[in-house]
């Protein structure tokens, strides 16, 4: 894009109309582009009972703690949650489970949550178990506007029941649908006011995929940085996928700590 200094006054206006030269953003436009919200509750304003939500994280790593707590305090119910797991009894999505706010869970692993097991066995919650890689691809596909895809994972098991199975090059594949949700809640390391996000280490798990899958995405970040501080090649989720940004402190609880005895030679 050419600088305005290279255009004489009369040509500058014509260049802007033709799209050669962009007009500087107005104050109102800058305000509209600012996606930072004062709290998770403000960012989640408008969510209703029965909403579907994609929640990032893997175990307790990289989970959107602030949004989960806000949802608990808001008391919205009959939620359909898509997430790798359902947290533990007293943390993560387990808080919503204990509060009877989740109607259906689409997940890969639920073994760390005793409350989940109790509700499942009592028929109080609907569960759709999905192979982990398939769940990741369903979220990515939904965010990319792909309605479905074929995978060999799950063929010949309960995963493939009531789903279309086709053969390609002599091998069977099951049709899986992309996942699109009303909302997505994710957690990133750094973000800017335009919603560009950068994740750190293992927290870059299901978060980028969930951010794509949500029609409205709320991202909570540890650090808010100036636009441009995150190099383009380090932006993991472009701001086009994010509608709201919340800054806060996170407990980052360790799900399970294991140690290895020192080996003495």
Where are these regions (language model features)?
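Intrinsic structural disorder/low-complexity segments
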Residues: 15-16, 20, 139
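Intrinsic disorder
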Residues: 3-6
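Conserved alpha/beta enzyme-core scaffold
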Residues: 29-265
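Short, Lys/Arg-enriched N-terminal segments with co-localized hydrophobic residues
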Residues: 20-32
């Amino acid at each position: 894009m050419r600088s305005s200094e290279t255009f004489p006054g009369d040509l500058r206006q014509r260049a802007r109309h033709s799209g050669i030269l962009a007009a500087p953003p107005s104050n109102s436009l800058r305000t509209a582009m600012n996606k930072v919200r004062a709290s998770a509750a403000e960012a989640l304003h408008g969510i209703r009972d029965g909403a579907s939500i994609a929640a990032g994280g893997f175990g307790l790593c990289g989970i959107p703690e602030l949004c989960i707590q806000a949802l608990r305090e808001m008391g919205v119910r009959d939620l359909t949650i898509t997430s790798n797991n359902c947290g533990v009894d007293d943390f993560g999505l387990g808080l919503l489970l204990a509060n009877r706010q989740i109607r259906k869970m689409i997940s890969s692993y639920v073994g760390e949550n005793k409350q989940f097991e109790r509700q499942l066995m009592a028929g109080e919650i609907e569960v759709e178990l999905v192979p982990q890689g398939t769940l990741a691809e369903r979220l990515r596909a939904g965010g990319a506007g792909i309605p479905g895809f074929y995978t060999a994972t799950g063929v010949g098991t309960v995963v493939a029941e009531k789903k279309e199975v086709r053969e390609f090059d002599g091998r069977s594949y099951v049709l899986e649908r992309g996942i699109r949700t009303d909302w997505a809640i994710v957690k990133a390391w750094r973000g800017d006011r335009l919603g560009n996000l950068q994740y750190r280490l293992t927290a870059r798990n299901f978060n980028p995929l969930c951010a794509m899958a949500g029609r409205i995405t709320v991202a909570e970040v540890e650090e808010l940085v100036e636009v441009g501080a995150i190099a383009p090649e380090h932006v993991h989720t472009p701001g086009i996928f994010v509608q709201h940004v919340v800054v806060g402190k996170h407990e980052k609880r360790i799900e399970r700590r294991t140690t290895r005895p020192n080996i003495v030679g």
